[in-house]
Amino acid sequence: PHRGQAFVFRATYDYASKYLFEVNMGYTGSEQFSSKNRYGFFPSVAVGYVISKEKFWRKAMPWWSKMKVRYSDGTVGSDNASENWLYYSTYSKNSVGLIVEDKAANTTARWETARKQDLGIELGFFKDQLSFNVDLFQELRTDMLLKPVESPLLGITSKDVNSGSMKKHGIDIEGKWRSTTSRGFYYELGFMLGLNENRIVKYDEPVNTPAYQKWEGTPYKAARTGLEQIDGGYFASVDDIHGYPNSLGSIDNTYLGIYKLLDFNADGRVSNLDLHAIEGVAYPPIVGSFNIGL
C-alpha cells in the first residue's frame, strides 16, 4: 500500500473561444519522504490563441477554417522509488542471528520533478475537412530517484537517492482527411508521425568508469541490460594465440578454433575494462501509423 495526499487548484479563462488561458497548481504529499520534504508544489500554465476566430482572418482566407497556437509549461512530480519509506532504515537478521542494519535511511530524499513544455499548432482547411496538429515538446527530468553507487566495503546499502537527470525532446505530427461522398458514404484517412529522443544528462556511476561503459551522455535505452565482452573472432593460428593476453597479461586455456574476446581498450590485456554495454532500442526514435475510418 502507498499513501499520499493532494490539493489541486485549477482556473480557466475563455474569451469568445479565441483567447484561452489555464493555470493549475498541485500541492502533493507522499509517505516516501521525511516530513521536511514530504510535500511538493507543481504548477503549470497553458495559453492559446485561435487566430482564425479573428474577423480579418475569416475575411482574407475563408478556406483556412482553423488556426490555433497554444503553449504549455509546467512541472509534475514522481515519488516512484524502488521501495517505500526512504527515510527509514531497514534491518534484518544475519547468519549468526544478530539484527543488523542492511539498508541505510535517506532522510534528504525529495520529489523527482519533470518540467514539461509544449508548443502546438492546430490547422484546419475547408471547414476542417483537412486538419493537422503539430506539437514540439521537451521535458527535463531532474532529481531522479536511483540506486546509489556504493563501495562493497561498507557492508550495507542505501535507499534511493536523487542522483539522475534526463532530457527528452521531439515532435508529433497528426493529419486527417474526412469527407462524405455524393452517395452519403463517410470516410476518413489519418496518419501520425512522432520523432523523439531521450538522453541521460546525469547518472551516478563509479569513479573512473570508462566512457564507453557510461550511461551519462547517452540516449536512454531501457533495453540496456548490462555489460558484456565483445566477440573478437576465433583463434586461427599459433601466432594469434601468442598475441592474445588475458587479464594478467599471460596466456592460458587457449587453443585453435575457440573464440576470443576483444581487447576493446587496447591496454594489452583482456579484463573487465573491456566490457561494453549491451544495448537495444526499447523506445524507437521514430514511430508512425496510418488509419482508415468508415
What are these regions (language model features)?
Residues 1-224, 287, 291:
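Extracellular/periplasmic, surface-exposed regions of secreted and cell-surface proteins
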Residues 161, 178-282:
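Conserved small-residue
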Residues 279-294:
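Glycine-rich, aromatic-lined ligand/substrate-binding cores of catalytic
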